[in-house]
């Protein structure tokens, strides 16, 4: 049985569906969106037929491939909160923030292929279908120049798998630096290294630069976003969340102000209808990230919060 027949049977599609999509896949839709700090980002959206095969690959192939414990984005039961919490619980005072430039597009199919050869035994049918499977992944999950596109549902899993080598080597090298005792996490392209060693930023950056030269993917540091921060007497922002001087996690001030403003407008009966769902999401977000802040909000805006939550439940 060819791999295409396997996909047809397991997705309950008609015979020949997968091979037909493979022969002439419908090109993805694409559009450009502006980045916050200038430039454009291209987003790709696969056709429904291609997406069906992508989900089959996610369930039967990519979900079985390992990723490093330091990876926190696109991982079940992990979030921006658990990422920030790990650094907060380490009680480290000094933070180095490193952004990987063009993270998804810097990953090529050859990078995936190289990593896949190390772990192919985890997939039950790879021995029989190796070449077919790799060709399918190249055609269905990568775009014409063999780069990993932003927007495909398969891209996050592939990216975490390919970046495993980076995470592994960086963790080993950082652990080998005497007295550094660093905590390392990666949330997609956003890397945080925290430590209690003052003045360690050069050591950490040199470690990164050496490691980048040793691995397959062409990852590059975005120097414009490189930051060194200290929690002494203040707070640090980790993946959008605030790590306070007493090491508890809370929302950024701007988000708190936005929630208060929306609740105030609701209490006065002038919150726009289209903002009701936004407020419901903000409240759920606040409750998850900082229950203490949510409790304070609830004391002041109990009726408003109850009303917006009931409205959300009716919609569901």
UniProtKB/Swiss-Prot annotation:
PANTHER family: NUCLEAR INTRON MATURASE 1, MITOCHONDRIAL-RELATED, RNA-DIRECTED DNA POLYMERASE. This is Retron Ec73 reverse transcriptase. Part of pro-retronphage phiR73, which is homologous to bacteriophage P4. With the help of P2 bacteriophage, is excised and packaged into an infectious virion. Retronphage phiR73 can lysogenize a new host strain, reintegrating its genome into the selC gene of the host chromosome and enabling the newly formed lysogens to produce msDNA-Ec73. Its EC number is 2.7.7.49. The keyword Transmembrane helix does not apply. Mg(2+) binds at residues 99, 189-190. Disruption phenotype: Bacteria no longer produce msDNA. Belongs to the bacterial reverse transcriptase family. Residues 247-316 are annotated as: Necessary and required for recognition and binding of RNA. GO terms for molecular function: metal ion binding; RNA binding; RNA-directed DNA polymerase activity. Reverse transcriptase (RT) component of antiviral defense system retron Ec73, composed of a non-coding RNA (ncRNA) followed by a ribosyltransferase/DNA-binding protein then a reverse transcriptase (RT). Expression of this retron confers protection against bacteriophages SECphi4, SECphi6, SECphi27 and P1. At multiplicity of infection (MOI) of 0.02 cultures grow normally when infected with SECphi4 without collapsing, at MOI 2 cultures enter growth stasis. Responsible for synthesis of msDNA-Ec73 (a branched molecule with RNA linked by a 2',5'-phosphodiester bond to ssDNA). Residues 1-243 form the Reverse transcriptase domain. The C-terminal domain (residue 247-316) is required to recognize RNA. It holds the Pfam family RVT_1. It catalyses: DNA(n) + a 2'-deoxyribonucleoside 5'-triphosphate = DNA(n+1) + diphosphate. Keywords: Antiviral defense, Magnesium, Metal-binding, Nucleotidyltransferase, RNA-binding, RNA-directed DNA polymerase, Transferase. It comes from the Bacteria. GO terms for biological process: defense response to virus. It comes from Escherichia coli.
């Amino acid at each position: 049985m060819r791999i295409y027949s396997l996909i047809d049977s397991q997705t309950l599609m008609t015979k020949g569906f997968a091979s037909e999509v493979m022969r002439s896949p419908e090109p993805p839709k694409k559009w450009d969106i502006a980045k916050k700090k200038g430039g454009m980002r291209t987003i790709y959206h696969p056709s429904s037929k291609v997406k069906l095969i992508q989900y089959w690959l996610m369930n039967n192939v990519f979900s079985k491939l390992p990723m490093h414990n330091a990876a926190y984005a696109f991982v079940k039961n992990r979030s921006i909160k658990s990422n920030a919490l790990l650094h907060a619980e380490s009680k480290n005072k000094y933070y180095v923030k490193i952004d990987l430039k063009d993270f998804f597009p810097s990953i090529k199919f050859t990078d995936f292929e190289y990593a896949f050869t190390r772990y192919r035994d985890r997939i039950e049918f790879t021995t029989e279908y190796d070449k077919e499977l790799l060709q399918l992944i190249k055609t269905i999950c990568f775009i014409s120049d063999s780069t990993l596109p932003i927007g495909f549902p398969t891209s996050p899993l592939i990216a975490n798998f390919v970046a495993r080598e980076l995470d592994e080597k960086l963790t080993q090298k950082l652990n080998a630096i005497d007295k550094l005792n660093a905590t390392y996490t990666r949330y997609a392209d956003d890397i945080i290294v925290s430590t209690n060693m003052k003045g360690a930023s050069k050591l950490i950056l040199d470690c990164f630069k050496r490691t980048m030269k040793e691995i397959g993917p062409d990852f590059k540091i975005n120097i414009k976003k490189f930051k060194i921060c200290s929690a002494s007497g203040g707070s640090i922002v980790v993946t959008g969340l605030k790590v306070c001087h007493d090491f508890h996690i809370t929302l950024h001030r701007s988000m708190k102000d936005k929630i208060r403003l929306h609740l105030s407008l609701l209490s006065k009966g002038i919150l726009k209808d289209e903002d009701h769902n936004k407020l419901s999401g903000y409240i759920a977000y606040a409750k998850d990230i900082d229950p203490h802040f949510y409790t304070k909000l609830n004391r002041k805006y109990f009726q408003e919060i109850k009303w917006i939550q009931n409205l959300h439940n009716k919609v569901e």
